[in-house]
From Swiss-Prot:
Disulfide bonds: none annotated. It comes from Caenorhabditis elegans. Disruption phenotype: RNAi mediated knockdown targeted to the intestine represses expression of vitellogenin genes. Belongs to the TALE/PBX homeobox family. Pfam families: Homeobox_KN, PBC. This is Homeobox protein ceh-60.
Amino acid sequence: MDNLIKQLQMSVSSENVDRNFIEKCIEMNPCRRMLHEVLLERKDILRSRMNLVALYDTDEQSSEIEEILAQFENPTFPLEEVNTEKDEEWQPLERKYLDGINRIKEDTIMKQIQLDKDMEKALTNSEEVLRNHRDFRPIDEKDFSNIRQSISKRFEHSKNNIRGEAATKILVLRREIEQQGRKRRNFDKNTTDILQNWFHDHRQNPYPSDQEKAELAKQCNIKISQVNNWFGNQRIRTKQQALRMQEDERERAASMANEAQAIQNSLNSSTVASSSNMSTSGLINIPLVNPTMQSMVIPAVQPGLLGNPNAFLHQPHYFTAGGQMSLNDNGNGQQFFTDYETFGLAQSDTESFNQMGYLG
């Protein structure tokens, strides 16, 4: 066994050794079969410890990176154009951006092509190594599959790194273009004041003529195209501000109406609740008709009363006779005072009644 191990070490470490001679010696060695069985057992142990899920699992590409790399096929200028007329100052920036995108794209494609070539070379070499090892140790098809999968995964990870680097370069390029464009678009305070004063003085019709544009450009030491862009942007900003103010006013009016309705509903609920509580507690549970006063209803006038004075004496009393009602109670629980002996209009005798002069 020791002799066999030494021969294996010689075949691995030495480059000038006669390979055919070593292979023949190993094949004829009586311990070769025993070594083969030991290697198979060792191989099974190693396979049981391998994480085959991680080996065959592939890295998912980031959706954000793919969205950024879409600039390769459909590049979009970072600076938004608010006017149909393109600013002359932006044209060099746009060319710079497109050239930068093309350079990043070409560099990424070249790196991916080189990775593909290296992966094919690595796969070929690894398969050749396994075929050579087959003469000394047990090799099956699963070994070829595992090594191909391992190499492919490593190179796929490298490709994802290259795409991530390309996305980072695109973001840096866009940020540079945005900063340069912002510097070109921002005027100094004096230029801004001149343009804003003209816009404010002509706010009813903020559209300068060609002559006025040329004069403003001369005063501000800028180009006419920049004057056009500034007024276009200013008109849009003013319109958007007016729309926002109208929307805020509508929301404020709606909020005030809702608050007023809520207050009114609260007052109505309070009134109904108070009335319900008063009715329940008996505070307004007062009878409309006093039973004691029901006997005081004036009866209908009898026929012949007006034609015969004496007939009036025979009419029933309008009110209850004296002594039948307490002088300190009018039937409703209230105290009263009277100069008459009784509470009735009709007197107890005819002479007293005539003295009152009711009939003239």
